[in-house]
Amino acid sequence: TIKDNTPAADGEEYFATSLLFASARWGNGEGIYNYNKEAQEILKTMLHQADDGQGVNMFNKEHKMPVFCPIGNAATFSDPSYHLPHFYELFAEYHLPAFYEVWAREAEQDNDFWSEAAEASRQHFKDATNEKTGLGPDYSEYSGAAKNEGNHGDFRFDAWRIAANIACDYAWWAQDDWATTHANRIQSFFYDQGVDSYGNQWSLDGKNLSPDHSPGLVAMNAT
């Protein structure tokens, strides 16, 4: 049953990957317990929803990146925190950075696309994050430029997850040593702001936008 016509792409990314892991761990049963079948259907829909002219894909095929939301103008830009190359790599090979790396290996179709999406996302991390602070925006153009819509061109709540996604991709696949450069960069920035008290919202060049100290951001930085 459809609950909402405007899903955020990252939810489906986690659903598909969790189902692939369930299939590998417990095997496949009947109906909704055929985990691999359910995962493959999600992957196919994410990339081919628009094939019949009735919808919008969750991934932009030209740029090989997740859209912010598959509806209207929200499908014309991305969200760096939705980029999960470690998943895409697995999707490309599973027929086995980190989600896309998974999809590149485990999907039954579009494997080359998912492998290319992993590389596109790794490059996007470099393009979207500040070279001095390591901070990235909530929303971004496909070029990596900040998308300042509703103040989401700054480092706010979505952007907390970027560092964790970069770290997870490197932990799983170690495809790009730039990940360690970024980790050192962003952790040094927050350490200098007061490791026990740094604020939770910033401009990309390091101006504090909120004094609130959030355990969620601390957890992402610890990853």
For every predicted segment, state its role.
Residues 2-27:
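Aromatic-rich carbohydrate-recognition surfaces in CAZymes
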Residues 6-10, 33-220:
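Extended ligand-binding clefts on enzyme/binding-domain cores
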